[in-house]
């Protein structure tokens, strides 16, 4: 048995058993006000039970919250994905679901949102924004990391909710447009909505808002227009830290894709002095758990005392990832060359 597997399965069984019990009880609820109130109470109990079971399932270091949320059907379960928003720095907030991140970078002149997740989790993001006392109409830009639905699927609804301009690379705007109407596998196959095409970002572009002067880098591979952003300034009292958001490593299949992966890795390694890696998913291979996980760091942040180091300030996370990207890219090129030589 994998270490922690029994603990995880036991915790997840509790989720399904308790949720099923509440659903069976709700089947007998009639239209009266009292019965409606009982139905709401039952739903609340189911939600609380799911949260408790999830918490119970993450007591082992081998099964942190990041991993639970990522596993198979759990990435589709709304109750499993519901987490409270949290403040990471004076000007950075996490407002997304459990498995994929959504961040808000604040400035006195307006805010920038990084990624939107997808339905059925967008209502959670809207609620989390309000819980952090952020005025959604102060969000000026929504930046999409790449054209996969789990990163842009909530953009249309949040575009309307905030009035912000949605921003992506031209290559991935094309991907986004091609996704319109396709089934969303995390929302019972409902058709995917796409945002209005507001604004393009290209390699070397700058996006300035308040004290933030962001520099855009493209890294084709995971998608044709995958990007990462440097220049993010994070405040923790009197301290400031240099942040970076997004991926950047890896290339597309084939020799040309692998060679592009090497170029991407060189670009990633050229960014120096990064102190905070703002992840696009709660987990982050190859750093593993709990060191690379957003929620593991958040747990440490919640109990941080004055004078303690900030758990999200960790230059090694980005440096290790950058080095791994370079090593993996070179291996991929060698593998593709060997395939070409052998004819396989």
Residue ranges and their predicted role:
Residues 29-34:
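Sec/Tat signal peptide C-region and signal peptidase I cleavage site
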Residues 68-72, 81, 87-89, 111, 118-120, 138, 197-198, 206-209, ...:
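Metallo-beta-lactamase
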Residues 35-110, 344:
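Zn-dependent metallo-beta-lactamase
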Residues 19-27:
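Bacterial N-terminal signal peptides
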Residues 36-54, 315-344:
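C-terminal regulatory/interaction regions
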Residues 77-132, 136, 228-249:
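Conserved beta-strand hairpin/beta-sheet module of binuclear metal-dependent hydrolase folds
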Residues 92, 120-123, 129-206, 296-307, ...:
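Active-site HxH/HxHxD metal-binding segment of metal-dependent hydrolases
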């Amino acid at each position: 048995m994998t270490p922690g597997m029994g603990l995880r399965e036991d915790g997840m069984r509790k989720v399904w058993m308790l949720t099923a019990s509440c659903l069976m009880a709700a089947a007998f609820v009639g239209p009266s006000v009292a019965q409606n109130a009982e139905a709401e109470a039952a739903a609340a109990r189911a939600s609380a039970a799911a949260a408790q079971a999830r918490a119970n399932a993450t007591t082992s270091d081998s099964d942190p919250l990041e991993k639970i949320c990522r596993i198979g059907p759990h990435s589709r379960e709304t109750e499993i994905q519901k987490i409270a928003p949290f403040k990471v720095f004076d000007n950075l907030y996490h407002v997304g679901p459990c498995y994929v991140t959504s961040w808000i970078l604040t400035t006195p002149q307006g805010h920038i949102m990084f990624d939107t997740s997808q339905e059925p989790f967008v209502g959670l993001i809207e609620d989390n924004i309000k819980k952090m006392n952020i005025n959604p109409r102060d969000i000026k830009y929504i930046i999409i990391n790449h054209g996969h639905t789990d990163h842009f699927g909530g953009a249309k609804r949040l575009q309307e909710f905030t009035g912000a301009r949605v921003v992506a690379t031209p290559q991935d705007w094309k991907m986004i447009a091609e996704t319109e109407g396709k089934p969303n596998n995390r929302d019972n196959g409902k058709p995917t909505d796409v945002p209005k095409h507001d604004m393009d970002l290209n390699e070397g572009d700058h996006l300035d808002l308040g004290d933030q002067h962001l520099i855009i880098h493209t890294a084709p591979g995971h998608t044709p227009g995958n990007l990462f952003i440097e220049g993010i300034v994070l405040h923790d009292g009197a301290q400031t830290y240099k942040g970076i958001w997004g991926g950047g490593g890896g290339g597309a299949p084939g020799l040309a894709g692998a060679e592009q992966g090497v170029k991407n890795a060189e670009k990633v390694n050229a960014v120096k002095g990064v102190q905070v890696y703002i992840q696009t998913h709660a987990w982050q291979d190859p750093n593993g758990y709990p060191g690379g996980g957003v929620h593991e760091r958040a747990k440490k942040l919640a109990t941080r005392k004055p004078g303690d180091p900030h758990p999200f300030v960790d230059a090694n996370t980005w440096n290790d990832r950058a080095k791994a990207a370079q090593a993996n890219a070179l291996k991929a090129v060698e593998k593709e060359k060997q395939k070409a030589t052998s004819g396989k």
